[in-house]
A protein has these predicted regions:
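Gly/Thr-rich phosphate-binding beta-strand-loop-beta motif of the actin/hexokinase/Hsp70
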Residues: 1-21, 97-117
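Conserved phosphate-binding/catalytic loops in two-lobed NTP-binding clefts
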Residues: 79-83, 230-249
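Short beta-strand-loop/turn "lid" adjacent to the catalytic site in phosphate-handling enzymes
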Residues: 28-33, 50-83, 120
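Glycine-rich phosphate-binding loop plus the immediately following alpha-helix
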Residues: 35-36, 116-159, 253
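Glycine-rich phosphate-binding/hydrolytic loop that grips phosphoryl groups
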Residues: 133-137, 240-265
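Glycine-rich phosphate-binding loops at beta-strand->alpha-helix junctions
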Residues: 204-232, 243-247
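Short glycine-rich, Thr/Ser-proximal phosphate-binding strand/loop in the N-terminal lobe
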Residues: 5-38, 42, 46, 119-122, ...
């Protein structure tokens, strides 16, 4: 018996296939296109083919994310919020998880969980690009570096530059000025990571960090941001092997639990 989760985000679409034990069999990630229904279907197809399965082998599909409702109308059986799915995925992988930090392409959120894994409180930033993947993407283009290389590059910084602007537009101008003044890109990048950490750290303070702290979302792949955030909040942060797919994975776990609750193996 197999289950699927599909997370259609504003930037990337993710899909996961798991078995009845919750084991991840396959996953797929692709850039979200204008036709979200098509992107979701194609990502789901790539995923079940990777697992050596057919669409009819998937017992239940749960959708989530920015395009969750679109997936629901196109091919999914049910839709759950990102808050619920990221919490479920993080708790499944890290049973002692009490705080989830999700930094995606267009928003960031912090979720507090009780001992049972239920959401006790959450806050999110979805009105400003600062503290999101989009912020780092813009800065990477200005600096002429690859987005995926920013993390490891920042670790080489010896003289970190402080970025005072929290607004993406103003920070963009600030970075250009810093480059013109001769500051090294590596030091600017380290400063940018601190700026993201301060922004997200403000959300963490509203919820209250409690161990274990788990980070999800594509930005979690950036070791520079993770280290800066650990310093900002004063807690060790656990990073899943594939942090970008945790929402989809959590959705798949929910699909499994819903079906097996009705018809246990």
């Amino acid at each position: 018996m197999y289950f699927a989760g599909v997370d259609i985000g504003a930037v990337a679409t993710k899909a996961c296939i798991i078995d009845a034990e919750g084991k991840l069999l396959a996953y797929a990630v692709r850039k979200t296109a204008a036709d979200m229904a098509k992107t979701g279907k194609e990502t789901f197809k790539r995923c079940f083919m990777e697992a050596g399965l057919k669409a009819q082998d998937i017992r239940y599909i749960v959708a989530t994310g920015y395009g969750g409702n679109i997936a629901l109308s196109a091919f999914a059986n049910e839709k759950f919020t990102e808050i619920t799915c990221h919490s479920k995925g993080a708790k499944w992988l890290f049973p002692k998880c009490h705080t989830v930090i999700d930094i995606g392409g267009q928003d960031s959120k912090v979720i507090g969980l009780d001992d049972a894994g239920k959401v006790s409180r959450f806050v999110m930033n979805d009105t400003c690009a600062a503290g999101t993947g989009r912020f780092l993407e813009v800065m990477a283009k200005i600096l002429g570096v690859k987005l995926e290389k920013m993390g490891e590059i920042s670790l080489e910084s010896k003289n970190k530059v402080q970025i005072t602007s929290t607004c993406t537009v103003f920070a963009e101008s600030e970075v250009i000025s810093l480059m013109a003044s001769g500051k090294k890109p590596v030091d600017i990048i380290a400063g940018l990571h601190d700026a993201v950490a301060r922004r997200v750290g403000g959300l963490v303070k509203q919820v209250g960090a409690k161990d274990d702290v788990v980070i999800t979302g594509g930005v979690a792949k950036n070791i520079g941001v993770v280290k800066a955030l650990e310093k900002e909040i004063g807690h060790k942060i656990h990073v899943p092997a594939e942090p970008q797919i945790i929402g989809a994975f959590g959705a798949a776990i929910i699909a499994k639990e819903k079906v097996l609750a009705k018809a246990p193996l």
